[in-house]
């Protein structure tokens, strides 16, 4: 089966330049991507998508729309679909941060206890992914896969041997 014409829209998280020479740039990346709730999905639906698609003739069908992310944007992609499956029905999360950075560790329990949503999920992680004060990424992704299986989601989980890097999903 051939893949239909596809348009990818990529968002770089904004940063605030350092105010002093040698200082660090600041970012709201973790607040925007790792937080649970509908805020980021609302931004995409109400502000971002209308701006980038105004001159494009796109199908208005959530079954034809997906969202992808890696690391913090991996959990962000899942959160957008979880909160708004009427807009995002397919999710790909590479080395997703389903750990306790800003509450993502609760997703396996939520998935098990909440009526299934009309989303398809692909998760991918590596055995040598992060293990730090926020949690253990391979274990967190395994817990996500187990919860999706328990709740009878259409999902796929692939565990490789890589670490926390952009080589995943490539």
Model segments located where?
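Non-catalytic cap/lid and distal C-terminal segments of serine-dependent acyl enzymes
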Residues: 1-170
């Amino acid at each position: 089966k051939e893949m239909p014409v596809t348009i990818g829209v990529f968002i770089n998280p904004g940063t605030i330049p350092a105010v002093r020479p040698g200082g660090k740039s600041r970012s709201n990346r973790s607040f925007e991507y790792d937080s649970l709730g509908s805020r980021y999905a609302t931004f995409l639906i109400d502000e971002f998508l209308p701006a980038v698609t105004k001159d494009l003739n796109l199908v208005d069908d959530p079954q034809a729309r997906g969202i992808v992310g890696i690391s913090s944007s991996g959990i962000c992609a899942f959160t957008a679909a979880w909160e708004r499956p009427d807009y995002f029905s397919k999710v790909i999360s590479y080395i997703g941060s389903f750990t306790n950075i800003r509450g993502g560790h609760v997703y396996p329990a939520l998935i098990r206890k909440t009526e299934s949503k009309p989303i398809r999920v692909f998760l991918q992680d590596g055995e040598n992914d992060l293990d730090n004060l926020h949690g253990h990424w391979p274990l967190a992704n395994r817990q996500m896969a187990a919860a999706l299986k328990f709740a009878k989601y259409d999902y796929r989980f692939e565990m490789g041997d890589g670490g926390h890097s952009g080589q995943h999903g490539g």
